[in-house]
Amino acid sequence: MVVLLLVATLVALVYYYPEKFICVDSGPVTGDVIVVLGGGLRERPVRAAELFKQHAAPRIIITGFGDDEINRQILLQNGVPASAIEVENKSQSTRDNAEFTIKLLRAEHARRVILVTSWYHSRRALKTFEHYAPDLTFYSRPSYYAFDWKDWPKHGNEHRMRMEFLKLPGYWLWYGVNPF
């Protein structure tokens, strides 16, 4: 009974304060490369282009199967030169994003990496990359919808949050990626 109460309390805290647990934002940083995780959401490459224009990093790697060309076009439309864009288009999961992109990062001797994904995906993405490449330094600069944190359920994010609530412990159990 006590365990159930503790779990219910934790779920309630995460639900009402997702920005404290789910979202990880490292704040303004510079790195060797920006990595944009795929996911079919336009705000990710737009955010990466903003960071590129702010000189956060000189290169961008797009990672993810299926939306790589769309993301490349969005980057180009937002002022990122083609010479600064590299594409990894084999990955189909966050774990794959890390596995395939880390090979590229090591081949290019990148040490400081800025990850761009959606706010609700930022913790799992950051922890997954850190798990598979503890020798590299990763920062999270997620994209945000323009809304008040207290109103996040009203913006179509409940399904995404439920999926993250399942995927965070799932990644811990299956791949050993500690979400804390």
For every predicted segment, state its role:
Residues L13-V14, P18, Y171-Y175:
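Structural signal for membrane-spanning alpha-helices in multi-pass inner-membrane proteins
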Residues V14-G156:
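A structural signal for short, hydrophobic/glycine-enriched beta-strand patches
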